[in-house]
Amino acid sequence: MSLTLKQTLTPYQRNATAVRGTKVGEVKVKGNFVYITNRNDKKFNGNDSLTQYTISPNGSLTWTANTSSYGTYPRTFDINKAGDFVAIGDQTTSNVAIVPRDPKTGKLGERVADLRIGAAGIPENEDGLSAVVWAE
């Protein structure tokens, strides 16, 4: 078996360079969309971000949007079974943000709920919130 590089992308529009220290936390595919969490990019007034890509018929990815994670160090996220809500688990701020998702366009909306889970963590300490899942 061999692998062939097909595309190189950054998580930002026009393939802009990521801020030094930014890390990808999690990657998920839902339908024709790929989502990734961007840890430590502070793209939204100190909050980190999620990136959405659209998968073309030939398999290439096109940047679609960056949206706020509504906290810092988005370690994990989960899309509900219906595909219309996303739970974002921000590790360092120990919060779960719920945002709507359009199942047709894949676009994420503005936060509709937020819950703090335990004490906030310390950046780079790997403490705080570590996982979110929908119990459906």
Model-found features: residue ranges?
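Feature marking well-ordered beta-strand scaffolds used for ligand recognition
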Residues: 1-136
